[in-house]
C-alpha cells in the first residue's frame, strides 16, 4: 500500500461512524490549572496518574478511534512501565500527537496570535512516527472582535497549517488541522459564521496550493456559536444550521471527516449541539464528510470532578468518562436526549 493510500485509510479509521477522538493533549500548564481547580498540587506524577486513568478505561476503544497526546504524555508510561502509546495501540486506539508549540503575539497585529512550531518539525514527526503516532494535530487560534481576525492573520496561520500538513503527510502521519475560532467574545452568530467561513475557505485554499492530499486530512473545527458574552445565546438548532451551512460553503467534499472541538462549552451543551447537527444532517440526507466529536473539557470535566486525585475514585471517574462518551456517541447519531444526563 502506498503512503497516500495508508494516509487515506488512517484518516477514514479516525472518523469511524459513531466514535470520536479524545483530546487529552493539555499542556502541563493547562493540566496543572485543572489540578489546582480540584485543590490538588500541580505535580507531574498526578498528571501521569490522570492520563493513566483515562487510557486504561475499560471499553474506551468502543467509543474512540484515537487519543490526542501532548509531547510529555507520549513519552510517559503506565505504572507497569508500558508506554502510553503502546497501551493505546494494544486497545486499537490511534495515538495522535499535538505538534504545535502554542501561540505567540502576531507582531504588528494587536490582539492577534500566530502558532509556532514549524522549526525542526520534520525530525520531530519522524520521532513521533517511531513512537507509534499515526496522526498529528496543529491548532491555530482566531479571536473575533470588531477588527479581528485580520486577513493577514488568517493567511499567515493558514499557510502555517498547510506547511504542517504537508510535512505530516511526507512523514506518513495524518494531519489534523484545527483552526479554532474562539467562543469567547461578544459577537453574533452571523459574525461567527462569517469569520469561520472565511478562515476555512482560506485554509483549504492553502492546503490545495501546498499539494496536500485532502483525502488524507482531518478537519478539527469549532461549532459556529454566538460569542459567550453575546446577549442571545444560540439554540442548538441555530448552531446546527449555521455550522453545516459554513461547512457546505467552505469544506471540499474530498475531506473524509470533520471533528468538533467543545471550545469552552459545558459538556452538556456541546453534546446537545452535536445532537442537533446530527439530526439536521439526517434531515438533509447526509453530507460528504463524516462528522464526529473531539472534545477535551466536554469529555473530561466530569471525569476530573469524580476523580478528585484519589485512587479510590478511579472507578467512578472512568464510569463518568464512559457515560460522557456514550452520550456523545448517541448525539453523533442524533439519538441523544437531555433526560439521559
Question: Can you name each region flagged by the protein language model?
Answer:
Residues 67, 136, 175-176, 217, ...:
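Hydrophobic residues within beta-strands of alpha/beta enzymes
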Residues 71, 140, 221:
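Residues that line or immediately flank small-molecule/substrate-binding pockets and catalytic motifs
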Residues 43, 138, 177, 219, ...:
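Conserved, mostly hydrophobic/aromatic
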Residues 101, 142, 181, 223-225:
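Short, histidine-centered active-site or binding-site loop motifs used for metal coordination
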Residues 74-75, 182-184, 226, 300:
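Short, active-site-adjacent cap segments at secondary-structure transitions
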Residues 183-254:
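Catalytic core of soluble alpha/beta enzymes
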Residues 1-131, 144, 232, 236, ...:
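Alpha/beta catalytic barrel-like cores
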Residues 121-207:
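Helix-rich catalytic cores of soluble enzyme domains
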Amino acid at each position: 500500500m502506498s503512503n497516500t493510500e495508508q494516509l487515506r485509510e488512517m484518516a477514514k479509521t479516525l472518523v469511524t461512524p459513531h466514535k470520536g477522538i479524545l483530546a487529552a493533549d493539555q499542556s502541563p500548564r493547562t493540566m496543572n490549572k485543572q489540578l489546582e481547580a480540584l485543590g490538588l498540587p500541580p505535580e507531574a506524577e498526578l498528571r501521569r496518574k490522570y492520563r493513566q486513568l483515562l487510557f486504561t478505561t475499560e471499553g474506551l476503544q468502543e467509543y474512540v478511534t484515537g487519543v490526542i497526546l501532548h509531547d510529555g504524555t507520549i513519552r510517559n508510561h503506565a505504572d507497569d512501565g508500558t508506554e502510553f502509546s503502546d497501551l493505546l495501540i494494544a486497545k486499537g486506539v490511534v495515538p495522535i500527537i499535538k505538534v504545535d508549540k502554542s501561540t505567540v503575539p502576531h507582531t504588528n497585529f494587536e490582539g492577534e496570535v500566530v502558532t509556532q512550531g514549524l522549526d525542526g518539525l520534520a525530525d520531530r514527526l519522524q520521532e513521533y512516527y517511531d513512537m507509534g503516532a499515526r496522526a498529528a494535530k496543529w491548532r491555530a487560534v482566531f479571536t473575533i472582535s470588531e477588527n479581528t481576525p485580520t486577513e493577514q492573520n488568517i493567511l499567515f496561520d493558514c499557510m502555517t497549517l498547510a506547511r504542517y500538513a504537508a510535512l505530516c503527510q511526507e512523514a506518513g502521519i495524518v494531519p489534523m488541522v484545527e483552526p479554532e475560532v474562539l467562543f469567547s467574545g461578544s459577537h453574533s452568530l452571523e459574525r461567527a459564521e462569517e469569520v469561520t467561513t472565511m478562515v476555512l475557505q482560506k485554509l483549504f485554499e492553502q492546503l490545495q496550493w501546498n499539494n496536500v492530499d485532502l483525502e488524507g486530512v482531518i478537519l478539527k473545527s469549532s461549532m459556529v456559536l454566538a460569542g459567550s458574552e453575546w446577549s442571545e445565546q444560540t439554540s442548538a438548532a441555530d448552531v446546527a444550521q449555521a455550522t453545516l451551512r459554513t461547512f457546505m460553503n467552505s469544506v471540499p467534499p474530498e475531506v473524509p471527516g470533520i471533528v468538533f472541538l467543545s471550545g469552552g462549552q459545558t459538556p452538556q451543551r456541546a453534546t446537545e449541539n452535536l445532537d442537533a447537527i446530527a439530526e439536521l444532517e439526517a434531515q438533509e440526507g447526509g453530507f460528504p464528510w463524516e462528522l464526529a466529536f473531539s472534545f477535551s473539557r466536554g469529555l473530561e470535566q466530569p471525569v476530573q470532578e469524580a476523580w478528585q486525585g484519589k485512587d479510590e475514585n478511579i472507578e467512578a471517574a472512568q464510569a463518568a468518562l464512559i457515560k460522557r462518551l456514550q452520550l456523545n456517541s448517541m448525539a453523533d447519531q442524533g439519538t441523544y436526549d437531555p433526560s439521559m444526563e
